[in-house]
């Protein structure tokens, strides 16, 4: 058959051609025998039919693939497993000892859950004969090399003994479908033979008709060349070498009485007749073996010459000795027979030593000389050839001879191939030089180019997948027409040669037969060429296609003449994918009059509703049919919404934008930050006074607690507790009680509060505060209003230090010490220092300076501080001795005084709370935030240096917005392919749009950008705020966009997805939150689905068609009803982000935004997802049969074999299969390292994953399955998280967070260590052989410090270079220390 075509191998595309699809579709209508030339890709037809049978027809039935040889069975099974890796399949051949499986239980166990079996015809015929396999079990029978189904061949026995009787008795539903594959349906020249094969197989022989011209373009006819030689007369007594003549003489004069079998009969008294027969016929085991050996030796001399026969004889004797030493190779021979043969042949071998290899010793036969002469005329640079010989011995010796002959050894890399069956027969023990092991890698080496010439028996005529050859030589004439056609088909490279060696002694009639065959072949070529020329001439006919379509709104016109170009333009801008051809496919169908109608099939990323469009009319020329079909296709694309009103694709066009947002500069003028104190200033004119208690605590110590009061002219918002950092070890906590309305506050109380507020503001400062006391917010002790006056009299003002000393005031109740010589600098009292100066006591004070830092909202790393409490030790190093006469001491105790330092921080946070409250009551009223805490964080720009800023919430909001928009576009635009969805999302979530949204709703006024600077801070006054006019401020448009995302993130943190969606709707009204509704459930989802896979996913699909779509690669174009996974992968990407972000947001470890970004980047890294895809396996039971020698029988062995997730992906690209195998090989080498890093490593395995360099489809199917689960579950993220948990991603996330795994990319680490001086340059380089690799150079200060070469990707090169750089930088740092 059935090899894959060379063009397919070159292009790497499994995508079926039109003529292959024609044959596949024909096979669905009736039983057919596909007759196409060797190399035309009949395998594709079989693969399509197998897939269709498993998906849509009778998936519970068994598919049996029959091939004539064991080698071909293994090859076809390999093709099936590579292209349909999820299908459970196996081979059954003589190597499995199936002839000894004599129990039904063995067969039942072997075939249990099996979907495809590949075997020789004899295996199935014998199994059916013994009743182990029944016709009713089979859904499809595929006959490779179907021309064998004749006479008593096992293929015909299957049909005649089982298929046809069942068909007659039970009808067509009781028998399997039949698909035959052949390049030569006629074996002989009998005209009735084709009809006989069709009758035997109950099938019609078909060849492509509608797309025959395409078939001809993919098949190449070789030039037939005759090579003449004069044969050797072996009967001439002088002919032959001394060794050959000695062998012939020895055998002819052999004394049969020495034969072990005759000796055995002589010793027996019951075998007289047997002895008589043996002596008369001379047929014993040993003598018959020697006879065949002599015949082969003579044949080799005649065919190849003297050196060849000497080599054959000596090599055979050496091989015999090896077999005797290895008793396992001669189980059927007793020791006496072995010794007899060895002794007989060894005596002959003494005549002459091994044949020499000097040039003059190579005396070829005339036939070999003709062959070598022909080979010498071939082109060395492109040579790839096959030589067919009849006998196995000839094959082995000829390959050896060409490998050592002076004229050929340097030009050809030879190997022999005789197949994998027959070599173990006991009658061939002498003279059988080629073992299975010796030819195991022959074909693969030929495909790879390591060998360029194979000498083979007719085993390579049929089916075996070998590369297209430039030369095919028949060393012996083909036995029949079938062999002639099959061998000729091997020479399918362009300008190839098919040569046959002819003896000058051939009779004229024999020669005439081949001349007639050649003439018939040439006539067939000429007939095909004539038809092709007629078709080309027909295309010159003028046929007018008048179709026209106009878009009224724009005047854009579509005509048949422009449609083809528009269609190709549409396909060209679809997202490019590896292994995928986005060009539209054109096919034709014909009516009874020879007219045709075109059909265009678009790439699988296009919605199935418009993927296939058929022309509406029949045409004489292909050109006209093409135009009209393209016109209908473009018109449907427009009606489906994939072309705009200008009849252009939507990508990068305004149609993907829901609104035109216009551009914004990077820095824009926006409203000044909203000032809530202005509203409070006006409120004092008619106050509704509210008051809140402030409870101050130090280090959580209940012994130090201060109660204060905050008063305002209107309702006070709920304030969150505040943490103020006095120093590195002392922390104040401020808690705010719920505000209470205070009715009828007298004016003197207000004045007392203003005076007390001024007292607190002045207390810790050396500067005099302003005389104005009309503060918008008032502070005082937590006392009844009636006691405020007395409190003020008691605590206001100061005393001289000497007066305080004389009253012996206790230290804890003392106030701030002020040094009048230094502008009333406030000091912290430590102790009195009294000295004697004569009779006069000199009183001095030991004091400490107050801490210089005033921004207590920010945590700082400071030395141990001082707080005036009994628990705080002294610090002599900071002591200052000051004369008491130069100081005053405030009456307000220091424990109250420090509250004055808290007022600026309290009002800063109160201002932020008031702004957030106003925002929640106006713009974000519908969101219904539970508190202002999240909102304050969301509107605080990093430049404000507030206790919290929006960066963390912006990270959350970015993922929530991306996720929400992805869901909206996916649901709203089922007609959009993934490229449109991606670009549509980018248009909505771009910073420009988000910044415009912030301006549209007035969000700019609520963004906190002013930095809190306590040293420059002044208490807000009514008189000033009442006259202020709001201005403008410059602000980055990115900050506007970030705040939009951070508010979405805040809503998400406050109330989950529902509240986040409400916030999105308010800020971005064009985004409609669509419910996630899966498509209607189809009756059956066409896919080879494994029940274990469904269970292992952790989710039961309501609509399995979604899972099928999730597993359909874009290269899979044969299934016109299923879209490729790209749309689901687009959605799954957003879902994965959301699952990861949700896990981080709700984890006990709270990470900063920068670290979360790195973690998310690491977790959603395509190589990591690909690794998890390769590790995600489904256990499947596999049963095999083991021989039990002791019991003389067989035992069934069952084991669980893993089936990886990637095996279920549907693809039609040969290059993809090859790339997949390469990646899996790297996976096997890197797996242990990556697994260890994921479970135990302190660092993320960047280098190992970059070396894995997995193709994107591995990670794509993880995301597409996640998208399918999300849609099928109607948007249930918890269910999606379960799948992410099962593949191993969430457990690794938890380990990263818990163990603080370093996920920073090595390049960033290198940049950090080098302080940004490391310059990385990665380039793709191509060597002299055309092999590409990546090279990375790292320079520091213009000096190369690292060079990495030979990498598979730029990522691998950069990671390796970065790690090397890190090692150098750290080593240098250690050396400097």
Swiss-Prot record:
EC annotation from Swiss-Prot or TrEMBL: 3.1.26.-, 3.6.4.-
Cofactor(s) essential for the protein: Mg(2+); Mn(2+)
One MF term in the entry's GO annotations: ATP binding
Motif DEAH box positions after renumbering to this chain: 144-147
Residue ranges annotated for the Helicase ATP-binding domain, each copy included: 23-203
Any GO CC annotation of this UniProt entry: nucleus
Keywords linked to the UniProt accession: Antiviral defense, Antiviral protein, ATP-binding, Helicase, Hydrolase, Magnesium, Manganese, Metal-binding, Nucleotide-binding, Repeat, RNA-binding
Residue ranges occupied by any RNase III domain in the UniProt entry: 916-1056, 1090-1274
BP terms from Gene Ontology: defense response to virus; regulation of defense response to virus; siRNA processing
UniProt site positions, description: Important for activity: 1256
Binding site for Mg(2+): 1129, 1260, 1263
Coiled-coil intervals: none
Entry similarity comment: Belongs to the helicase family. Dicer subfamily.
Name of the protein this chain belongs to: Dicer-like protein 2
Gene of this entry: dcl2
